[in-house]
Amino acid sequence: MSTVASAPAALKGGEWIIRESKPEDIFTPEDFNEEQKMIMGMCTTFVSNEVLPIIERIDKLEPGLMPSLLDKAGEQGLLGVSIPEEYGGLGKDFVTSTLVNEGLGSGFSFSVAIAAHTGIGTLPILYFGTPEQKQKYIPKLTTGEWKGSYGLTEPNSGSDALSAKTSAKLSSDGKYYLLNGQKCWITNGG
């Protein structure tokens, strides 16, 4: 039995469909190390203790409830599992991050909120941001002080990003952006 479950080199695009997998590239729950199991347990405990008891209040969109849950998740390090330590994250590997997603996955709409925060709001900055952007945004997103949100769907284009009409134009003084357009909803917008 392996002492550490780790993923092989990253696949590109849909390569997993056409590439043959070697048995040593496959891992099962029996291969997870103690730390990975502990983190997974922390996630399932978080959902059981913090999310599920108030699920009806979440479903009724009680103001401030979802942001407070994201704050609690940030306090426990759950918003920064795959974020490098230099930005305040835990710096864990892909397998551990996947276990966190599985552990939080039973949290109904909370699972969507945390996935949008990390997968749409934080990770693109980590992967594609400038060093200045990473330093400015990632630490506060990792703690939950700032919330990652996402607004795609528009009345006349649905969720077709290429048909979106909303624009962002830099102000004449270069200090902020002026947004112009409509969105049907914004994930984590409240």
Could you say what each language-model-derived stretch is?
Residues M1-E35:
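Intrinsic disorder at enzyme termini
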Residues K12, E75-G144, N188-G189:
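Internal helix-loop-helix
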Residues E30-V51:
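Mature N-terminal segment immediately following signal peptide/propeptide cleavage
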Residues I54-E75:
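Short secondary-structure junction/hinge motifs that connect adjacent elements
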Residues Q36, V47, G77, P84, ...:
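Buried hydrophobic positions in well-ordered alpha/beta secondary-structure cores of metabolic enzymes
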Residues F46-R57, G148-S149:
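Short alpha-helical functional segments enriched in proximate histidine and acidic residues
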Residues G89-L90, E132-G190:
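Glycine-rich, Trp-frequent "lid" loop and neighboring beta-strands that shape
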Residues S2-G14, G41, N49, G77, ...:
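Alpha-helix capping/hinge segments and adjacent helical runs
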